[in-house]
Amino acid sequence: MKDIDMGKEYIIPSPGYRSDRDRSAVPGQHRDPEEPRFRRTRSLECQDALETAARVEGLSLDISVHSHLQILDEEHSKGKYHHGLSVLKPFRTTTKHQHPVDNAGLFSYMTFSWLSPLARVVHKKGELLMEDVWPLSKYESSDVNSRRLERLWQEELNEVGPDAASLRRVVWIFCRTRLILSIVCLMITQLAGFSGPAFVVKHLLEYTQATESNLQYSLLLVLGLLLTEVVRSWSLALTWALNYRTGVRLRGAILTMAFKKILKLKNIKEKSLGELINICSNDGQRMFEAAAVGSLLAGGPVVAILGMIYNVIILGPTGFLGSAVFILFYPAMMFVSRLTAYFRRKCVAATDDRVQKMNEVLTYIKFIKMYAWVKAFSQCVQKIREEERRILEKAGYFQSITVGVAPIVVVIASVVTFSVHMTLGFHLTAAQAFTVVTVFNSMTFALKVTPFSVKSLSEASVAVDRFKSLFLMEEVHMIKNKPASPHIKIEMKNATLAWDSSHSSIQNSPKLTPKMKKDKRATRGKKEKSRQLQHTEHQAVLAEQKGHLLLDSDERPSPEEEEGKQIHTGSLRLQRTLYNIDLEIEEGKLVGICGSVGSGKTSLVSAILGQMTLLEGSIAVSGTFAYVAQQAWILNATLRDNILFGKEFDEERYNSVLNSCCLRPDLAILPNSDLTEIGERGANLSGGQRQRISLARALYSDRSIYILDDPLSALDAHVGNHIFNSAIRKRLKSKTVLFVTHQLQYLVDCDEVIFMKEGCITERGTHEELMNLNGDYATIFNNLLLGETPPVEINSKKEATGSQKSQDKGPKPGSVKKEKAVKSEEGQLVQVEEKGQGSVPWSVYWVYIQAAGGPLAFLVIMVLFMLNVGSTAFSTWWLSYWIKQGSGNSTVYQGNRSFVSDSMKDNPFMQYYASIYALSMAVMLILKAIRGVVFVKGTLRASSRLHDELFRRILRSPMKFFDTTPTGRILNRFSKDMDEVDVRLPFQAEMFIQNVILVFFCVGMIAGVFPWFLVAVGPLLILFSLLHIVSRVLIRELKRLDNITQSPFLSHITSSIQGLATIHAYNKRQEFLHRYQELLDDNQAPFFLFTCAMRWLAVRLDLISIALITTTGLMIVLMHGQIPSAYAGLAISYAVQLTGLFQFTVRLASETEARFTSVERINHYIKTLSLEAPARIKNKAPPHDWPQEGEVTFENAEMRYRENLPLVLKKVSFTIKPKEKIGIVGRTGSGKSSLGMALFRLVELSGGCIKIDGIRISDIGLADLRSKLAIIPQEPVLFSGTVRSNLDPFNQYTEDQIWDALERTHMKECIAQLPLKLESEVMENGDNFSVGERQLLCIARALLRHCKILILDEATAAMDTETDLLIQETIREAFADCTMLTIAHRLHTVLGSDRIMVLAQGQVVEFDTPSVLLSNDSSRFYAMFAAAENKVAVKG
C-alpha cells in the first residue's frame, strides 16, 4: 500500500477490524464498554494517532495482521504441515498467496528463484522503495508467530513455574520441526561435499598416475564431480532457506512478546530504557542469527567422523592424526567462541549503559545546553565508551582467532599426518596425499561455520536470559473489584500501598517542608509508627496474594505460578508510601486532592490506576479511566491524532473539546492547524500547550472516571480559570473527577476536598467543612489569600469585559473545517529519514580507513593478510613440490638388487622437506597472531573515532535538529549502527579480505598448473560481473530499507515506554501492540528479503564455481600424461576449495558493503549536521568576572525557530536594569519562553542583538555565555547518577556549599535521611523523586551557580502554595543581587516584581510596574489578573 498524505481520505488499516463481528472474534480482546460500536470500512478524513507515527517516517502500511489469522484458520483445517508439504512440489503455477515465497515450488524455493523478479526491478530502477517490497508473508507475521510462542511459554510456566521455566526449551520447541529438517538437509550437504573429494577426486588423481588413458571413464568421473557439487550446493541452499524463515518467525514472535510484556509492566525501573531498546533491536537480531546459523554446528562432528574413517582407510593408522587435529580444534574453537561470548555479555551491559545515557542526553539536550553541561555529559559517555571499547578489544582478539584458524588447521593436520606417516616408513603417493588434503579442505567448511554457529548460539543464550528476565517482571493489574454500592465509583478500605524498591529509593521517606517538621510527631500515633517498622518478607508475600484479590477469577494465577511469584516477590523490598487510606468517591463528584510536595498525591492516583502494590486493605473501582499525567505525554503524530488517540473523529465533539481546552488560538499559530506534526514529546510546543492537549485527549475519550494530576500547573491564570470552569466543571459535570492541584483557589468549587500529608489522608470534606475545621488546609488556604490579594480594588463587571477584551486582541480562533487539509512542508515538523542512494561511495570507505589510522595502517594490515594467506598457499605448494620430487631419483638397495625408488620416504633430503613444511606452520601461526592484534586495534580505533566524532557533532547540533529528528532515529545510530560498526563489520571485513586474497591465490595456483584454465575463467568472469552488478544493488537497497524501517520501530518503543501509565489508564495496550506489530512487520519484510538476497546470490555463484571445478576436472582428463600428478592434485584440491570459498567471498563482499551502510549513516550525520557556535572563541572571551552588573538589553531582536517558519519574536526592544526583578506574562505561545531561548542562544536571532553588560552575546562562545546564566526550568529535570552529580557535575563546590543550597530549598532533611546522603542514587528521569522535589533540586542547582542573571520558567508550578511561598522567599533572598526574569503563569508569583512585561504574538505590548498596570483597567495585565483574582477574592 502506498503512502497516503496526511489529511486526505483513506481507510484506516489499524486495528484492522472490518466489523463488530470481526472485532469480537479476536481472542483475548474485550470490547471497551465506553467505546461506541463502529465500522472501519468507510472513508474518514481523520487519522489514527498510531498510524501517523509511521507516516511521519515515510512508511507504507501492511494489511492488517488479523487477516493473516483468518487465512491461517482456513488452511489449518487442511492439516498442520499442509503449507510446508506443498513446497515439495517441484514446480507450482498457482499464485494464491500475496508473497512469492509462499507460491514457490521446491526448485524455486531452494534456489531462491522467486526473488529474481525483484532483482530485475531493482536493477532497472537503480533503487528500491518501500512500496516495491512485498509485505511480509502471513506465515512470518509477528502476530501469528507470537501467539504460538506465547502459548508455548504459558504452557512451560504452568508446568514448572516461573523459576524453573526454560525459555531455551520453549524456543527449541517453537523451531524444532524446521530445524530438524534443516539439519537433515545439512547432512545431505556434508555427505555430497565429502563424497566428491573422497571418492571422485581420488579416482581422478589415480587416473592421472595411470599410464593408459580411458576417456569415457574419466569423463564419467568429471560428471560425478559435477553432480556431487550441485547436490552439495542446492541442499545447502535449502538449509538456509528453511533457517531464514525460521529465524524471521522467531525474531518476530519474541520481539512481539517482549513488547507485549513491556506494555503490561507496572514500571520499567528494573530495566533501563537503554536496555529495553537494546533487547528490542540487538537481542532480536541475536535470536534470528541463532536460528539461521546455529543448526550448522551439527555438520561439524559428522564430517569429522567421516573424514577420520576415510583417512584411516587411505593412510592406515596415521590417518587418525589429521582427524585428531580437527577434532581437537573443534572444542578449542568452541572454548574460544565461548570466551568471545563471555566478553560480548560484558560488553552488552556497557552498551546498555551507553545507550541509556545517550537517551537521557538526547531527551534533555535543551537543559544540558542551558546549564553548559555538555562537557560533563560528554566525559560521562566517553568513560562508558572507553570501558565498552576495552571489552570489545578482548572479544575482538578471540573472534580474530576463530576467523583465522580454519585455513591453518588444514596445514597443521597435513604437516602432522604426512610427517609422522613418512617418519614411520609408510609410502605416500600424490593420489593419497592430495585426496587427504582435499578431504581436509572439505572438512574446513564445518570448521569455518563453527565460529559463526557457536558465536550466534552463545550470544543468543545471553539474549534468552535477558528476554526471560523481562518476561518474568511484574505486570500492572488494573483493579477488577467492583464497589459494593452502584453509586460508588472508587472505594479504598484501610489500604496501605507501596512502590517496589526498584521504583523508589526515597518515596517512602517523609517529605518535609519547614512547617511540617513541627507537626511530624503529632500526625501519627505510636501504633502507626510500629506498623511502619513491621516490614517483613512475609508481608511482601501477603501483599502479592492480596494483590491477586484484585483480579477476576480467570486472571488469578495457578497454584504453581502462585508459588513462583511468592519467591519472586519475597525478594522484593517494598517501600510503603500510602498508609490506611479510607476513601469512597461517589459517581459524578469532583474531588480535589491537595497537599505539600511529596505528600503522596500522585501515589494515590497511581494506586487507583493499579500501578502500586497493595499491602493491606482493599481497592475497588467501577468504570473506565481517562488520565492526564503530571508531565504530559505526547505522541509523535499530529495534534489531532494526539487528541483522538485512536477514537473515531466526531467533528462536533472535537470542536467542543478544542474550545473547552482553549486550543483554538494555538491552532491559528500552528502552520498546518490541527494537522501539524507536533514532534516527539511535543518538541515544538510549550509546557502549557502539551498539558492542554493531554487534557483534550481525556475530554474527547468520554470515560466515566477522570484522573487529572495537576493539569493546570503550567497554564496562564486566565486560561487555567477558563479550562477549570469550561472543561472540568461544565463538560465533566456528570463524570467522576479526581483533581490533584496545588492551586487551592480551584478547590472552592470541588464537591469534596482531600488533604494529604506524609502518605495519609489527614483531612477530608467540602471546602467549607475543612475551613471550619481550622486544620492544615485552612492555614494554607488563608496564607494563599493573604499572600495573593493585591492592593487594588477590582470590579467584577470590569473583570468580565477586560477578560473579553484580552481574548479579542489575540489571534482569531482557527476553525477546524471538514474539507481535506492540504499537507504542507511546514506542517510536517519531523523530517523523513534520509536514505542513501546508489552504491556506498568510496568516500565512506576512505572515511573508515582514515579513522582506522590512515592509508599506511591500511597498507600494513593488507600486507599482513597477504603474508598470512601466502604462507598457507606456500605450505600446500611445498607439499606438491615434495611429492613431485618423489624419491629424488635415489637408488635403493634391496638385498643384492638395486633400483630407483618412487617413494618419498626414500628421498635423501626428506628431513629438509619435512622441516620446511613444519616451519611454514610455525610462521603461519606467528603471522596470524600479529595480524589479529593489528586488525582488531585498527577496526576498533575506526569505530571509536566515528562514535566520538558523531557524539561530538550531535552534542553541538542546534536545537532545531533535535526538534525535527525523533530520538529513536538518533539512538538508532548509537545502538544498531554502532553495534554493526563495532562487532559485525570487523568480523565480516576480516573474513572478506582473507577470502579475497585466498581466491586470488587459488585461481593463481590452478592457472600456474594449467595456463589454459584462464581461458575458461574469462567467460565465467563476465557472468560473475553481471551477477555482481545486479545483486549488489538488490542487497544494498534492501539493507538500507532494513536500516530505515528500524528507526520508527525503535521510536515507537521509546514513546510507548514513556507513556506506559497513560496507555494503561486508557486501556490502549492492544492498539499500541498492533501498531508495533505493523512497524515490526514493515521492518521484517525488507530484512527477510535482504537475507534471502544473500543466498540468491550464493546459489548462482556456486554454479560459477562448479563450472570452474568441472573445467579443472576436464583439463586433468584431456591433458592426461602431460602434467605431473602432484600438480594435478594441487590444482584439483584448490578447485574444490574454491567452490565454497568463491560464493562465500562474494556474499561477504555484498554483506560487507551492506554493513558499510551503517558507516555511511554515521558519516552522513558527521558530514551534514550544522553546528552551533563554538563553546569558547579565542580572543573574544568575556572578562572572568563578567557580567558584574547584570544589565540585559534587547535591540530589535527577531527570532524564528526554523527557516520558513513565522517570527516568534518581532522587533523586541527593552532594557532591564541591573538587579531588577522582571515578571514576564502572556498567553501560551506569546513568546515568553522564546525570550529565554534567545538569551541562551538555543536559537540564534534572525535580526537585532542582545547585550549583557554592553557585550553582544553573539560575539562570545556559548559555554562562556551559558555558564554565566542560571535557569530554573518549567520541566524539572534530574539525570541518572547521584544527588551530588545532579547539583554539581564538575565537582566545583564543597560539600558545605551543597548542603547549604539544599537547606535553603528545604530539601536538606529529605536528602539527609537517605542512606548515602549526597551519593544516593538518582534514577533515570529522577523517577525516585516527586515532581515537586525535582523542582526543589533544580532550584538548589541554580543557587549553587551564583549567576548574575537568573531565568525562572514557572519554577514553582508543581508545588503546593505553602512551599511555593517559602521558595519565593528563598529566591528573593538568594538572588537579591541578581537580575531576575520570571516567566509566570500564576500571576501572584510576579506581583512582587519591579516591572512586568506583557507579551502578545511575539511583541512587548506592556512593560511597567505592577501598580501602574493594575490601576489601568484597560491594560491586558489588569484583564488577566482580574480573571485569576476574581476566583479567589470573590469565592474564597
Swiss-Prot record:
Q: Where is this region: Disordered?
A: 1-41, 501-569, 798-822
List the subcellular locations: Basolateral cell membrane; Golgi apparatus lumen; Endosome membrane; Cytoplasmic granule
Among the entry's GO cellular component annotations, what is one? Answer: basolateral plasma membrane
Q: Where in the sequence does UniProt note compositional bias of the Basic residues kind? A: 514-529
The UniProt catalytic activity note for this protein reads:
ATP + H2O + xenobioticSide 1 = ADP + phosphate + xenobioticSide 2; 3',5'-cyclic GMP(in) + ATP + H2O = 3',5'-cyclic GMP(out) + ADP + phosphate + H(+); 3',5'-cyclic AMP(in) + ATP + H2O = 3',5'-cyclic AMP(out) + ADP + phosphate + H(+); N-acetyl-L-aspartyl-L-glutamate(in) + ATP + H2O = N-acetyl-L-aspartyl-L-glutamate(out) + ADP + phosphate + H(+)
Q: CDD domains in the record, alphabetically?
A: ABC_6TM_MRP5_8_9_D1, ABC_6TM_MRP5_8_9_D2, ABCC_MRP_domain1, ABCC_MRP_domain2
List the keywords (alphabetical): ATP-binding, Cell membrane, Endosome, Glycoprotein, Golgi apparatus, Membrane, Nucleotide-binding, Phosphoprotein, Repeat, Translocase, Transmembrane, Transmembrane helix, Transport
- GO biological process, alphabetically ordered: cAMP transport; cGMP transport; export across plasma membrane; folate transmembrane transport; heme transmembrane transport; hyaluronan biosynthetic process
Gene deletion effect:
Mrp5 knockout mice are viable with no overt phenotypes, deficient mice accumulate endogenous glutamate conjugates in several tissues, including the inhibitory neuropeptides N-acetylaspartylglutamate (NAAG) and N-acetylaspartyldiglutamate (NAAG2), but brain in particular. Abcc5-/- mice show lower white and brown adipose tissue and increased glucagon-like peptide 1 (GLP-1) release from enteroendocrine cells of the small intestine, and are more insulin sensitive.
Residues reported in the UniProt entry to bind ATP 2: G1226, R1227, T1228, G1229, S1230, G1231, K1232, S1233
GO MF, one term, reads:
glutathione transmembrane transporter activity
Q: Phosphoserine is carried by which residues?
A: S14, S19, S43, S60, S505, S509
Q: Could you say which enzyme class this protein belongs to?
A: translocase
- Disulfide-bonded cysteine pairs: these are none
Q: PTM Phosphothreonine: at which residues?
A: T513
Top-rank taxon: Eukaryota
What is the membrane topology here? Multi-pass membrane protein
**Amino acid composition bias (Basic and acidic residues), ranges on this chain:** 18-41, 545-559
Q: Which Pfam families match?
A: ABC_membrane (PF00664), ABC_tran (PF00005)
- Residues annotated for ATP 1 binding in this entry: G595, S596, V597, G598, S599, G600, K601, T602
- Just give the chief location class: membrane
Report domain ABC transmembrane type-1 positions. 179-459, 858-1154
Q: What does this protein do?
A: ATP-dependent transporter of the ATP-binding cassette (ABC) family that actively extrudes physiological compounds, and xenobiotics from cells. Mediates ATP-dependent transport of endogenous metabolites like cyclic nucleotides, such as cAMP and cGMP, folic acid and N-lactoyl-amino acids (in vitro). Acts also as a general glutamate conjugate and analog transporter that can limit the brain levels of endogenous metabolites, drugs, and toxins. Confers resistance to the antiviral agent PMEA.
In which family does this protein belong, per the annotation? Belongs to the ABC transporter superfamily. ABCC family. Conjugate transporter (TC 3.A.1.208) subfamily.
Further information in the entry reads:
Although other labs have confirmed the ability of ABCC5 to transport cGMP in an ATP-dependent manner, they obtained a much lower affinity for this substrate. The authors conclude that ABCC5 is a low-affinity cyclic nucleotide transporter and a major function in cGMP excretion is unlikely.
Q: What is this protein called?
A: ATP-binding cassette sub-family C member 5
Q: What is the lineage of its organism?
A: Eukaryota, Metazoa, Chordata, Craniata, Vertebrata
